[in-house]
């Protein structure tokens, strides 16, 4: 199959109804705080009229219909951006529970989940995750992070799973701090859309 490589934005890759898979032979999630901080600062420096470039990604179609792609290069960045999207949904959900724009934020939560994190399956009547990680990380990603559940004991997690959780915690804290004086679901959604 033909391999594609291009410069793309988060919106162009995730808001297209396609799914992405990390091949089982790819390394575990390994980004750490330095990488998360670099990405966070890159995002904060995006001019208002521009979008963030994900950087270079290499994708290979999994099948002839091209509705699913293998991530040959760029899985660490795409995984991290997916975690950032999860942190956005978690903060919007928190605000909704706190009574901040409750109905609007419920809608935002559902739409962001559908748009960035999963494709709606008519047969299952549920969301199928857009991202499948490697065998060591996928179960944790789908069972804990996608469901916005916090592990009871972090010490029992594999090192790469701890990094996934720590990335989520890092971005949730950054978003809370960034929007603490302006708890606006509209502004938080706009922030996500420019990535």
Indicate where each model-derived feature is located:
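Glycine- and hydrophobic-rich flexible loops that cap the catalytic core of alpha/beta enzyme folds
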Residues: 1-195
């Amino acid at each position: 199959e033909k391999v594609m490589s291009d410069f793309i934005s988060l919106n162009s890759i995730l808001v297209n109804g396609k799914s992405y898979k990390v091949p089982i032979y790819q390394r575990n999630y390994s980004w750490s705080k330095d990488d998360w901080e670099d990405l966070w600062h890159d995002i904060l420096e995006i001019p208002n009229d521009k979008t963030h470039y994900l950087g270079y990604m290499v994708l290979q179609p999994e099948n002839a219909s091209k509705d699913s792609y293998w991530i040959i290069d760029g899985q660490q960045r795409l995984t991290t951006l997916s975690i950032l999207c999860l942190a956005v949904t978690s903060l919007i959900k928190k605000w909704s529970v706190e009574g901040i724009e409750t109905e609007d934020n419920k809608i935002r939560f559902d739409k962001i989940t559908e748009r960035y994190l999963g494709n709606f399956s008519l047969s299952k009547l549920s969301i199928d995750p857009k991202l499948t990680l490697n065998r060591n990380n996928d179960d944790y990603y789908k069972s804990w992070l996608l469901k916005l559940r916090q592990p009871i004991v972090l010490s029992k997690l594999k090192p790469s799973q701890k990094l996934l959780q720590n990335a989520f915690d890092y971005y949730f804290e950054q978003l809370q701090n960034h929007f603490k004086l302006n708890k606006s679901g509209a502004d938080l959604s706009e922030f996500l859309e420019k990535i």
